[in-house]
């Protein structure tokens, strides 16, 4: 049995699993790979440690494309630490969208090179991805500019 955090969808694996679209590396310039913790449909509505799946998107200023759906292992809360296996599912991503993530798991995610971004409420993943696309289209913060291979915008002298 999976335990859900406040706000997490209880839809589970039976709800509609979205279909990924073909993608070849380099096809979307200035893009970043993003994992979203999901329990149902194309929603960002999961806790890192208990979500049913990770939706993997390639996101550029022009497009957010679902490129993979990776089922997460089903675990019981008292099992041996399972965050290592979950981190391996998203290791090729630069960003992780989640409703919540525990401290030790967040440390493992960050140490693997993935930057977790917590959301306060469950929502369609497209809302999160559209916000990210807008940031990429403008002047992203230096850490994000480096991830997509752009020079960080120079800070104007005061």
Listing of model-derived features with the role each one plays in the protein:
Residues 6, 16-42:
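Entry/capping segment at the start of metal-dependent catalytic domains
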Residues 68-98, 104-106, 115-123, 138-139:
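Compact, charge-rich alpha-helical regulatory domains located at protein termini
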Residues 31-81:
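Conserved mixed alpha/beta catalytic, RNA-binding, or beta-rich assembly cores of soluble enzyme
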Residues 1-2:
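Short, small-residue-biased leader/transition segments that mark boundaries at the very start
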Residues 25-29, 47, 88-90:
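Solvent-exposed alpha-helices and their adjacent loops that cap or buttress functional pockets
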Residues 109:
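Extended, alpha-helix-rich binding/interface surfaces that flank or overlap catalytic cores
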Residues 7-11:
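A general sequence property marking short-to-moderate contiguous segments
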Residues 114-118, 126-158:
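C-terminal binding/interaction regions
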């Amino acid at each position: 049995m999976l335990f859900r955090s406040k706000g997490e969808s209880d839809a589970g694996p039976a709800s509609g699993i979205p279909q990924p679209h073909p993608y070849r590396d380099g096809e979307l310039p200035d893009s970043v790979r993003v994992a979203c913790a999901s329990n149902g449909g194309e929603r960002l509505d999961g806790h890192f440690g208990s979500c049913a799946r990770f939706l993997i998107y390639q996101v550029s200023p022009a497009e957010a494309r679902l490129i993979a759906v990776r089922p997460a292992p089903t675990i019981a809360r008292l099992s041996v630490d399972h965050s290592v296996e979950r981190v391996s599912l998203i290791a090729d991503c630069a960003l992780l969208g989640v409703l919540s993530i525990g401290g030790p798991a967040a440390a493992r995610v960050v140490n693997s090179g993935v930057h977790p971004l917590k959301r306060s409420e469950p929502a369609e993943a497209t809302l999160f991805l559209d916000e990210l696309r807008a940031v990429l289209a403008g002047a992203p913060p230096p850490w994000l500019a480096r991830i997509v291979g752009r020079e960080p915008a120079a800070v104007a002298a005061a």
